[in-house]
């Protein structure tokens, strides 16, 4: 099982954690949402939960809860700039369909 990050995503997360001044890493998870069933969740982690799995890539810890891991295994977190827009992009090999707006997916 693995979760990886692109260079640009790792640099962005490191910047966020440095500016925040604390935190173990970044939580990547899923929640029920949207027209396709699931949406990604990103949040800072200060304390690990019992079922958390920790991945480290390029010096950044990515924490995934046990329930989300089955949907996220093999995902690469990227940070992209397209025109005036920028944000995290999830390259998830488990996704079967995405909604038209790109906010939710199913596996």
Swiss-Prot record:
<dbReference type="Pfam" id="PF01521">
    <property type="entry name" value="Fe-S_biosyn"/>
</dbReference>
<dbReference type="GO" id="GO:0005829">
    <property type="term" value="C:cytosol"/>
</dbReference>
<comment type="similarity">
    <text>Belongs to the HesB/IscA family.</text>
</comment>
<dbReference type="GO" id="GO:0005506">
    <property type="term" value="F:iron ion binding"/>
</dbReference>
<feature type="binding site">
    <location>
        <position position="35"/>
    </location>
    <ligand>
        <name>Fe cation</name>
    </ligand>
</feature>
<dbReference type="InterPro" id="IPR000361">
    <property type="entry name" value="FeS_biogenesis"/>
</dbReference>
<keyword id="KW-0408">Iron</keyword>
<keyword id="KW-0479">Metal-binding</keyword>
<comment type="function">
    <text>Is able to transfer iron-sulfur clusters to apo-ferredoxin. Multiple cycles of [2Fe2S] cluster formation and transfer are observed, suggesting that IscA acts catalytically. Recruits intracellular free iron so as to provide iron for the assembly of transient iron-sulfur cluster in IscU in the presence of IscS, L-cysteine and the thioredoxin reductase system TrxA/TrxB.</text>
</comment>
<feature type="binding site">
    <location>
        <position position="101"/>
    </location>
    <ligand>
        <name>Fe cation</name>
    </ligand>
</feature>
<dbReference type="GO" id="GO:0016226">
    <property type="term" value="P:iron-sulfur cluster assembly"/>
</dbReference>
<dbReference type="InterPro" id="IPR017870">
    <property type="entry name" value="FeS_cluster_insertion_CS"/>
</dbReference>
<protein>
    <recommendedName>
        <fullName>Iron-binding protein IscA</fullName>
    </recommendedName>
</protein>
<dbReference type="InterPro" id="IPR011302">
    <property type="entry name" value="IscA_proteobacteria"/>
</dbReference>
<comment type="subunit">
    <text>Homodimer; may form tetramers and higher multimers.</text>
</comment>
<dbReference type="InterPro" id="IPR050322">
    <property type="entry name" value="Fe-S_cluster_asmbl/transfer"/>
</dbReference>
<dbReference type="InterPro" id="IPR016092">
    <property type="entry name" value="FeS_cluster_insertion"/>
</dbReference>
<dbReference type="InterPro" id="IPR035903">
    <property type="entry name" value="HesB-like_dom_sf"/>
</dbReference>
<dbReference type="GO" id="GO:0051537">
    <property type="term" value="F:2 iron, 2 sulfur cluster binding"/>
</dbReference>
<feature type="binding site">
    <location>
        <position position="99"/>
    </location>
    <ligand>
        <name>Fe cation</name>
    </ligand>
</feature>
